[in-house]
Amino acid sequence: LSNMANASVKEFGKAWWSEVYNRIIGAAVFLDDASAECLHWDGGIFNLLNGGAVTVKTLSPFEVRSKVYKKAVFITQTTSTQLRTIHEIIQNSDFTHCILISCVSLDTVYLELNEGKDVSDVIASGRAQSEATKHLEGLLTEWIGKKQSAVEVVHIPIFTISPTSVVFLTPPYQNMYPTYNGKLIPDTSSLDLYTLTNDERSQVRRLASCLNSMLDSMNLKEDIFYMGAYSSLVAGVLENSPVCISRRKTCSNPASLIIVDRTLDLCAVTSHSMESVLDKVMAVLPRFPGHSNEVAVDMSPLCEANVIAHPEDIQLSPGCLFHANDESCMQTYDHMINKSQKEVMFDLYNKVSKIDVQKSPGARALLKVTPQSVEKIITATKGNYETIGRHLGMVQQALGVVQTLKAPRRAQLDLLTSLEAQVVQSLAASRDSTSVLHQISQLIKSRKDRNLPLENLLALIVHVYSLTGTEVSFSKKHEDNLSETLSVAIFEDHKTLFDEDPGRIVTPEACEEVAKGVMSRLKEVAQMRKILQNYQSVLKACEGGAGHEYRGVLQQLAEELVDARRPALPDLRRRHDPVKDLLRTGISMLTSKKPRASKHPLDNATVIIYVVGGITAEECKRLHRSVITSGVDNTVLIGSTRFVTPGEAMRDVLAL
């Protein structure tokens, strides 16, 4: 298991889940939300129940206790809060055998258990893992409180999901974002882990430790590159922690790991112009409860249940898009990322035609497949549970796409897409004399007439500030006017904009402060690419000469990365040990040989690009396409914290 050479991230996940399944026979299994989400992408709850678990529960102090279970398996991130929850569950149960599966490496857990103490000796000598194991096993034994008991603490790196063979996401880090004590730009130029809050520092260490486990399992010895201040911190932990250093001595397959801050370019994630069907579905349908990358499909059109409040209604479980045990569904899911809407609709129509009780015309006979033509076939199976059961995954996917394309929200997104296109051309044409902010202020004032949610207009404003960067200066008058307009709008829409306590009083003055905070964050967003050399501009003239288009930082990086001429990549930084660099320079002067050319990421067969702060399906498609069309032989994997929608990306960056 420690040497899955040349393996994909998907195989990495599967191999470690099988280690979990080996331990669950006869057990009550308790999972935290992130592990439950990872389980869904490996096949779901039946993997546990069919594998011998007697019950599966949420890791919660409110979970109903039962004295009948004697063995418990806890699958967790091993945070201090989760350890308290485990303590409560054990105290209220009658377990004699407890297994704690930590999804995070135990040396990282050891650092957190000893926050504020000097444990450098233990870390340097490599004893952190065994010390943490001993400590946690002692706690479990104490909590069980019986003479005859068995405990085990084991690290199993469950943290990835694989929507496709080249894309992976990391649910435990879904809320991780490049901020420093909550700010987008750090207060100091000498940045280190201690510039961060305790929680932020813990997240950086945890992510680095998980990436280390993945590289270890895939037998990869990496060169680390980064773009952005936050990514430099993750790179620093990976470069310098003793566990990572010793792993690089034993792993043999060379790889390049490129870590990128999302905040350098927020245009793609705040854009409403979506070609990928998956992005459209994610933007329209509600999230599956407890999940960051899955949607809830309303299944009531096929059932007799009278659903009132989808997806929370307890009468009927929501459907979803990803079905790990159905090859045909996984192919459709891949199409939803990588193919056009027309191709996805034909694919779905061909598949649902096989269950058609009314014998509709074949897809070839149709000039166009509409949501209505797919819906007609599916709803004809209402109440026919045997047929629905045989094609359950495909029916959920088809319903999800149909509900998205027929939703009133689609019309909102189309309007926002056209507004966005106008904004881009207006910015490109007028530059500093632009009246874009004035136009957006007018849009906010008339949003109710146009049926435009404030959340999406805020995403449009973030899009504008990230797109212009430092290339355009907005007039103070327009910015003040926008701040005033936002203040009124936030007060009017605060109930829909914030998930707030219904008893909380919101005043116009408080909303004015929120609006000022939004404006100062937007000005920081515009400064983000100042640190870059080649990728400061993302607004490029179209090749045909007509108008301008957005070409993102990730896209520009990918194109230069696979360019056969190997152009210099000054924006891809590497962390070097200055002492070693001095020694190398001294030795090369003595031996009079030319100094070595700097390393290029494609010198290594495997390249992993990881974006901290979210990515869209469309970006994954474009990055993958750049690699495929270039003809390079390298395996390029694309990872991120989660899939994001414009509304989520806006909330992340504005801290709303």
Where are these regions (language model features)?
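Extended, well-folded catalytic/binding cores that form a central cleft or groove in large enzyme
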Residues: 2-656
